[in-house]
């Protein structure tokens, strides 16, 4: 039981690295055709980008199936992927992109840091020059803003972190 729990926890942690890599090099690379829908105004309930969730869920289901058929660690790795997917769904789709019927914007703490970091990711038009590709771990918003200024030679014209009044000042109440 303890080993299984440890595998799940380590899988969730590993998924952050895998998700950041996938987001940066696949979604902003050859998978941009799907992911671009996530960087443009949404029309309707779903985005083409949602197909990535279906693919990742398929991998998790396959791991759980193979694991329950005899390769026991795989079911717990699949479980860890599922937990990460749930966290991603709650925070990314619910909190940041407000794809749910309720709308809440964090005003302080780590959730605000996640919120602002992802909004800064969307501050750049297109797939090049973005920051913050992971989601459970987020750098300080001030650091991300400095990277954006360095990459673009100016603050981004579209600073998505300032689209909402309570996210306007990421350095004022963001955790250090």
Swiss-Prot record:
InterPro entries for the chain: BETA-OHASE-like (IPR045019), Fatty_acid_hydroxylase (IPR006694)
Name this protein carries in UniProt: Beta-carotene hydroxylase
Residue stretches making up the Fatty acid hydroxylase domain: 10-126
Region Disordered: start-end pairs: 152-176
Compositional bias (Basic and acidic residues): 156-166
Lineage: Bacteria, Pseudomonadati, Pseudomonadota, Gammaproteobacteria, Enterobacterales
Record-linked Pfam families: FA_hydroxylase
Family: Belongs to the sterol desaturase family.
Pathway it works in: Carotenoid biosynthesis; zeaxanthin biosynthesis
UniProt organism field: Pseudescherichia vulneris (Escherichia vulneris)
């Amino acid at each position: 039981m303890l080993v299984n729990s440890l595998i799940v926890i380590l899988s969730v942690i590993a998924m952050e690295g895998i998700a950041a890599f996938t987001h940066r090099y696949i979604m902003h690379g050859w998978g941009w055709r799907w992911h671009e829908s996530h960087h443009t105004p949404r029309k309707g309930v779903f985005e083409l980008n949602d197909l990535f969730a279906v693919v990742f869920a398929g991998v998790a289901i396959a791991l759980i199936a193979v694991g329950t058929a005899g390769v026991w660690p795989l079911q717990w790795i699949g479980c860890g992927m599922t937990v990460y997917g749930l966290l991603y769904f709650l925070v990314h789709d619910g909190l940041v992109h407000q794809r749910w019927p309720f709308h809440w914007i964090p005003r302080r703490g780590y959730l605000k840091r996640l919120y602002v970091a992802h909004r800064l990711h969307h501050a750049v038009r297109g797939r090049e020059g973005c920051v913050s590709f992971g989601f459970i771990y987020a750098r300080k918003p001030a650091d991300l803003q400095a990277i954006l200024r360095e990459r673009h030679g100016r603050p981004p014209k579209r600073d998505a972190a300032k689209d909402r009044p309570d996210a306007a000042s990421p350095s004022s109440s963001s955790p250090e």
